[in-house]
Regions:
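Conserved pre-ATP/AMP-binding loop-to-beta segment of ANL
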Residues: 26, 140, 158-159, 163-196, ...
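Conserved AMP-binding A3 loop
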Residues: 38-42, 192-218
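Structural core segment of the AMP-binding/adenylate-forming
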Residues: 57-58, 81, 85-167
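Conserved AMP-binding/adenylation subdomain of ANL enzymes
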Residues: 215-236, 240-346, 356
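Conserved ATP-binding/catalytic segment of the ANL
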Residues: 435-500
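Conserved C-terminal "lid"/linker of ANL adenylate-forming enzymes
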Residues: 498, 523-526, 570-635
Length: 635
């Protein structure tokens, strides 16, 4: 079903029922007790109408902001569909945000109602509700909330989603005509969502995304990847509060009639994959890195013949992939060897993903080239995309039949990407889908964009909007990149750039990705701005350390945040030196300290999209960082 630029979010599912699937077909799958249970289009749309009816009875009007602080689940979809068809605005809040940030977002957006996912989050909302004057209803998605609600004596009404739906059903017949009329009156230019960017610095900013932003992005992504059909099953586990999962999974499924299954948690993702057998998944690179690390560890730890077979299979897969990607036909011998590798090794790894994956969509951060190549060797396609919350999000994505590892793919249709010289502000090149040339390469600069996927602006922040979108309509991403073999290639964020004391520019992300090839390193944070050389805070792999040194869990519960024992430092340093040879001398780590446990969202060190907050970490560990440099000078 071809989308037009007149499409709106509430039209998508109804068009699927009209043109693709009968309303009794399965739209969503949810784990209930031990099995995944189907939820039909009819159930979804009926619940949306009941929720809309309740909203109308309680004075909700077009343009009102409605909140979510809930994990991925069918209830999210019911609530969202219910508000979208009235022209209301989805404000999804990361469950991991601090009380202060949640309170700020509720008040900045002037939320009226909020759907809550867990008892812990309900407790948080009850605590901050007295400070949120526009909030009228807190809606737990669970029924056993009364005991907790008794601790609250304010004016905000607390009732479960089931109670809300039942109440709305009583007046649905009366409200039905109004709901249908309001749905038809939603315009593409109307605001659909405020997505508050976590950012690595500063106060959260509400990115204003319209129905046109979302639906246009879905349309052109399906043009770029026409292999997504109405028969797909997506497994959703990245947060729907993030624009990547919202567009690449939820909205794609709404538009294309694909099924969407919800994972129970990241910890149970592997189990859920075996149960759901997804054909498509949207992931972040960190998950792929973990799968790669585990597969390599399992494949090489057995020793003897098994390890030889595993390494031979990976090498064979690499040879086969390189031939295919060069546009040639593999020899009969290589094809036979590839089939043997598939039977002995690759099929067993694929089984752990459910066995039916056509491809994986990777986004949210740059995918290290070696990780893309590893999955390519197995015969699992990784389609890497690039974008930001402000671009709805996709700007470029890998084509199904053209893999250039280390790039984020071809410019999507109907947008223009420019590369701007950071110093002179001269636009070096402008590229579109139609100007694509597989041999084209450009100089490096800031990535800028024009198109229907660019946000309307930042909520209540006209100055920030004017900074981000210039007078010629270019949105400035703050990312550094270039074109390579016709595809867009990302270097790093401009604000991440380190300038050493010799004036040399150092982009930390590609350097960090080089060291993250090591199975001894779990996380790494580069330091070196205005310093003579590069140093790092390294979080060693807990699992591999425990195995190598026979450590107990108590070792990682020590109050000292850092590990000082030389045997552990030397163990990590072996791999630091090993991977340093891949880098220029000024990019190499000269010294490092070992952090006992990972950087986390809960400690305020990472964003919800798992990016380290550089300024926060530098400030938090300033003493340890300074000591590391002083030690170097003393030596």
């Amino acid at each position: 079903m071809k989308l037009t630029d007149q499409a709106t979010i509430p039209q998508l599912l109804r068009n699927v029922v009209k043109y693709i699937h009968p309303e009794t077909d399965t739209f969503m799958l949810e784990k209930v007790k031990d099995t995944y249970q189907p939820i039909s289009y009819k159930t979804t749309l009926d619940n949306a109408d009941r929720i809309s009816s309740f909203f109308l009875d309680n004075g909700i009007q077009k343009g009102d902001r409605m909140g979510f602080i809930v994990e991925n689940c069918p209830e999210y979809v019911f609530f969202d569909q219910g508000l979208q068809q009235l022209g209301c605005v989805n404000v999804s809040i990361y469950p991991t945000l601090s009380d202060d940030d949640v309170e700020y977002i509720i008040n900045d957006s002037q939320l009226k109602m909020i759907l809550v996912g867990t008892h812990f989050l309900l407790k948080k909302l009850i605590k901050i509700a007295p400070n949120c004057p526009t909030l009228t209803h807190i809606v737990p998605k669970f029924d056993d909330y009364q005991k907790m609600a008794q601790t609250y004596s304010g004016d905000v009404c607390i009732l479960s989603l089931n109670e809300l739906i039942a109440t709305g059903e009583k007046t649905l017949e009366h409200n039905s005509a109004t709901i249908n009329k309001m749905r038809d009156e939603v315009k593409p230019s109307d605001l659909s969502s405020l997505i508050y960017t976590s950012g690595t610095t500063g106060t959260p900013k509400g990115v204003m995304l319209s129905h046109l932003n979302f639906c246009h992005n879905v349309k052109v992504c399906l043009m770029q990847i026409p292999h997504i059909t109405s028969e797909e099953t997506f497994l959703s586990f990245l947060p729907l509060s993030h624009v990547f999962e919202r567009t690449a999974t939820y909205h794609i499924c709404c538009a294309q009639g694909s099924k969407i299954a919800f994972a129970q948690s990241l910890e149970l993702l592997g189990k859920n994959m075996m149960e759901v057998h997804p054909t498509v998944m949207s992931v972040v690179p960190r998950l792929l890195e973990k799968i790669n690390e585990k597969a390599m560890k399992n494949g090489t730890s057995a020793g003897g013949l098994k390890t030889k077979i595993f390494l031979w299979s990976i090498a064979t897969g690499s040879k086969y992939r390189n031939v295919i990607e060069s546009g040639k036909t593999p020899s009969m011998l290589l094809s036979m060897q590839r089939n043997i590798a598939e039977k002995l090794v690759f099929s067993k790894i694929k089984e752990k993903t459910g066995g039916n994956l056509k491809f994986i969509i990777s986004g949210g951060a740059a995918l290290p080239q070696n990780i893309g190549e590893f999955f390519g060797n197995l015969g699992i396609k990784i389609l890497e995309g690039y974008g930001l919350t402000e671009t709805s999000p996709v700007m470029a994505v890998t084509e199904f039949d053209r893999q250039i590892y280390g790039t984020v793919g071809r410019v999507i249709p109907e947008v223009t990407i420019g590369i701007q010289d950071a110093d002179t502000k001269r636009i070096i090149t402008e590229q579109t889908y139609d100007t694509f040339d597989e041999n084209f390469e450009s100089a490096e600069g800031e990535i800028i964009l024009r198109g229907n996927n660019v946000m309307q602006g930042y909520w209540n922040k006209p100055e920030d909007t004017a900074q981000a979108i210039d007078t010629d309509g270019w949105f400035h991403t703050g990312d550094v990149g270039k074109f390579y073999k016709g595809n867009l290639k990302i270097t790093d964020r401009i604000k991440n750039m380190l300038v050493n004391s010799f004036g040399k520019n150092v982009y930390p992300t590609p350097i960090e990705n080089t060291y993250l090839q090591s199975n001894r390193i779990d996380q790494i944070f580069l330091i070196g701005d205005k310093r003579e050389h590069i140093t790092a805070i390294i979080v060693p792999s807990k699992e591999n350390m425990m195995e190598e040194f026979g450590l107990k869990e108590s070792f990682f519960q020590d109050n000292d945040l850092f590990i000082h024992d030389e045997q552990f430092t030397e163990w990590v340093d072996e791999h630091v030196r090993k991977y340093s040879v891949e880098l220029a001398k000024f990019e190499r780590i000269k010294n490092f300290i070992l952090k006992r446990n990972p950087f986390t969202i809960e400690d305020g060190e990472m964003t919800p999209t798992l990016k380290i907050k550089r300024r926060i970490v530098e400030k938090k560990f300033a003493v340890e960082i300074d000591e590391m440099y002083l030690l170097e000078e003393a030596e």
